[in-house]
Amino acid sequence: MAKKSATKKKPTVKRRKSKKSVRIALIGAGGRSVSTHYPALSDLAEANVVAACDLDENRLQTACNRFGIPGRYSDYRQMIEREKPDAVYAIMPPHHLYDVSADIIERGCHLFVEKPPAVTTEQTRQLALLAEKHGVLTGVTFQRRFSPLIRRGKQQCEERGTVHTAHASFYKNWVGADAYYKGGMDMLTADGIHAVDTLRYLCGGEVESVAADSRRLDAGHCNIHLAL
């Protein structure tokens, strides 16, 4: 008689500790948060994740149990009032993000969000002005500029002098996938913006003019895979 195989549980992540730490609270316990942000914060000795918030109770408990997060909430306002974090990660759909981000900033917490930081350019400007008014730091997940390869490229650009013209291409497999947040984001703001940010970082200065185009290379299967 065959033995039943035991269900494997995901191991609890051991957190690094530091004498000097930043109190962090997270809004969102979905796929992007758990696959990227929670693990990254667990690797930072200075990051003390004190609480997390999500409307999905099961998802919240699963994430908090895995990463050893003590505070668990369904209301982010209550979480901020009780936990008093130094910074808040708001990892959520862009069409819900503006009001939450503005509220977090007005409460005096530093803010970190996924891209795009808002649905419109004007909303983004307003958040920037609000952050300046309240003296808080804000950040958006443009992590490619921290890649050793990109940093080396930045060094070479600075050594060679002023960049007058630059070009970037971005390819994305999208076979059988639904639109981002049912159309709440497009390909540029969701993914292609990484190429824009990397180009700006490499070149430095401010952009004076832009020319861009996009097209679909239709195929019934994934025919390209690129990563950086």
Please provide the spans of the model-predicted regions.
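Alpha-helical elements of Rossmann-like donor-binding domains used by nucleotide-donor carbohydrate transfer enzymes
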Residues: T62, Q78, A87, D99, ...
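Core-facing hydrophobic residues within beta-strands of well-ordered domains
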Residues: A47-V49, V163, V207
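Short active-site oxyanion
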Residues: A47-A51, D86-V88, T138, M185-M187
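N-terminal Rossmann-like dinucleotide-binding module
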Residues: K3-K4, K8-F67
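Rossmann-like dinucleotide-binding domain that binds NAD(P)(H)
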Residues: G176-L228
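Short catalytic-loop micro-motif centered on adjacent basic/acidic residues
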Residues: A90, L111-E114, T138-F142, A211
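Beta-loop-alpha module in the N-terminal Rossmann-like domain of NAD(P)-dependent dehydrogenases
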Residues: F67-A128
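A contiguous active-site-proximal alpha/beta segment in oxidoreductase catalytic domains
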Residues: A118-G176
